[in-house]
From Swiss-Prot:
<dbReference type="InterPro" id="IPR001737">
    <property type="entry name" value="KsgA/Erm"/>
</dbReference>
<keyword id="KW-0949">S-adenosyl-L-methionine</keyword>
<dbReference type="InterPro" id="IPR020596">
    <property type="entry name" value="rRNA_Ade_Mease_Trfase_CS"/>
</dbReference>
<keyword id="KW-0808">Transferase</keyword>
<dbReference type="InterPro" id="IPR023165">
    <property type="entry name" value="rRNA_Ade_diMease-like_C"/>
</dbReference>
<dbReference type="InterPro" id="IPR029063">
    <property type="entry name" value="SAM-dependent_MTases_sf"/>
</dbReference>
<comment type="function">
    <text>Specifically dimethylates two adjacent adenosines (A1518 and A1519) in the loop of a conserved hairpin near the 3'-end of 16S rRNA in the 30S particle. May play a critical role in biogenesis of 30S subunits.</text>
</comment>
<feature type="binding site">
    <location>
        <position position="125"/>
    </location>
    <ligand>
        <name>S-adenosyl-L-methionine</name>
    </ligand>
</feature>
<keyword id="KW-0963">Cytoplasm</keyword>
<protein>
    <recommendedName>
        <fullName>Ribosomal RNA small subunit methyltransferase A</fullName>
        <ecNumber>2.1.1.182</ecNumber>
    </recommendedName>
</protein>
<feature type="binding site">
    <location>
        <position position="29"/>
    </location>
    <ligand>
        <name>S-adenosyl-L-methionine</name>
    </ligand>
</feature>
<feature type="binding site">
    <location>
        <position position="75"/>
    </location>
    <ligand>
        <name>S-adenosyl-L-methionine</name>
    </ligand>
</feature>
<feature type="binding site">
    <location>
        <position position="100"/>
    </location>
    <ligand>
        <name>S-adenosyl-L-methionine</name>
    </ligand>
</feature>
<keyword id="KW-0694">RNA-binding</keyword>
<keyword id="KW-0698">rRNA processing</keyword>
<keyword id="KW-0489">Methyltransferase</keyword>
<feature type="binding site">
    <location>
        <position position="54"/>
    </location>
    <ligand>
        <name>S-adenosyl-L-methionine</name>
    </ligand>
</feature>
Length: 290
């Protein structure tokens, strides 16, 4: 019997008198086939260390620990720590850290892996309410995670993996795809969770690029420009950029020159631009002193 088997999950929760906290976005997966697919998608073996976020009662952790060199699981809810000590007692390669992943010194914790030089993959069922902050925090942390295989709200997975000229494409797509390739591996129906969420989930696989997708002069400025370009989706690039940089004649003149240099029409919308075109635009705007 697996931790994720519904009868086992129910028994564990009852034995420990556990009640779900909405503020932590807790939804426990009770489908062993899906858990197996997640671990297979992540290609976990004994030459990989794994960071897990939000292990819950250890359903996914169990599958990870059977194959990984080590698993370090970060759980914010202190009530789950004794439950995890119970459900994962047979594994000596799992460390549970009762910390908020957004506040912890991750670089320091990673040194506690027995072999910190092994590749590190992030595999997690992320809480919906904080998916994007956690992802961007990890991607921008400077820690060389080679891969992320994470469960999230399907809508967010679609936005992250979206391509230009689609409804889902936006600044989040650009922010992630600058660093990683991103592809939806498979869909997870809401019916396999306890309690069931209101929407379906998706497993998103992200692999770190050896180098960023495009070369830019100033990364922070590149992200600011891409974000500004999607402020109002139905507005043109010109309207969004004048809204961000200002509408003085001097600014308009610089914007006109930058757009011309980047080979872009003022009437185009942000959703039509590729990463390379955003890179060219950002560098041209920077060159104009904006």
């Amino acid at each position: 019997m697996r931790i994720a088997d519904y009868s086992v999950t129910k028994a564990v929760l009852e034995r420990h008198g556990f009640t779900f906290k909405k503020s932590f976005g807790q939804n426990f997966l009770t489908d062993t086939n899906i858990l197996q697919k997640i671990v297979d998608t992540a290609e976990i073996d004994d030459q990989v260390n794994v960071i897990e976020i939000g292990p819950g009662i250890g359903a996914l952790t169990e599958f990870l620990a059977e194959r990984a060199a080590q698993v370090m699981a970060f759980e914010i809810d202190h009530r789950l720590v004794p439950i995890l000590a119970d459900t994962l007692r047979d594994f000596d390669n799992v460390t549970v850290v009762n910390e908020d992943i957004l506040k912890v010194d991750l670089a320091q914790h990673i040194q506690n892996f027995k072999n910190p030089n092994l590749p590190i993959k992030v595999v997690a069922n992320l809480p919906y309410y904080i998916t994007t902050p956690i992802l961007m925090h990890l991607i921008e942390s400077g820690i060389p995670f080679c891969e992320f295989v994470v469960m999230m709200q399907k809508e967010v997975a679609d936005r992250i993996s979206a391509q230009p000229n689609t409804k889902a494409y936006g600044s989040l797509s650009i922010a992630v795809q600058y660093y990683m390739t991103a592809k939806v591996a498979f869909i997870v129906p809401r019916t396999v969770f306890v309690p069931a969420p209101n929407v379906d989930s998706a497993i998103l696989k992200m692999v770190r690029r050896p180098e960023p997708a495009v070369a830019v002069e100033d990364e922070n400025f590149f992200f600011k420009v891409s974000k500004a370009s999607f402020t109002h989706r139905r507005k043109t690039l010109w309207n969004n950029l004048t809204g961000y940089f200002g509408k003085t004649e001097e600014v308009k003149d610089k914007l006109t020159k930058a757009l011309d240099q980047a080979g872009l029409s003022p009437s185009v919308r942000g959703e039509a631009l590729s990463l390379a075109e955003f890179a060219g635009l950002a560098d041209a705007l920077k060159g104009q002193g904006l």
